Amino acid sequence: MSDTAPRNAVSAPQMLADALLRSLTGASAQLRMTSTTTDTNMSELGLTATSFVDAVVSPVALRKLRPAWKSDGAPQWELLVSATAVAAQVNALDLSSAAELFKLTLLVAVGGQDYLIESVTSNEAFGKVYLYRLLLREARPQSV
């Protein structure tokens, strides 16, 4: 059993966001990104295949946004991601920030559907991020 009592007011918004996301769906998302260990001469020349890493973040909630006028008419989605889950992946992958994690992300998979990130924003309280909001669009299959 773990002690989840907040020690100060700063951690309360993060705990509230985590509880809300878990109670809404409790879903998880996979962030597919290129491996950060491709710093060899062979990989720079394209002689080795690019490797990918999947980072799982949970809890998340996905919702479809209201249609807005766009030239392509593609639906947009918003993925609400727990800041504590993002921080855990940033530490696990030894990255400097959440912005770097989202920059490396090529694809987001939720419920078997693939999405591309259009933009990332964060919500914060008391100077600490408690939720990330990813604006997504569906990834269309590429024809070869």
Regions of interest found by a model, annotated:
Residues 1-37:
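N-terminal intrinsically disordered, low-complexity, charge/repeat-rich segments that act as generic
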Residues 2-8, 33-144:
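Short, conserved turn/kink motifs that form compact alpha/beta structural patches or helix kinks used as
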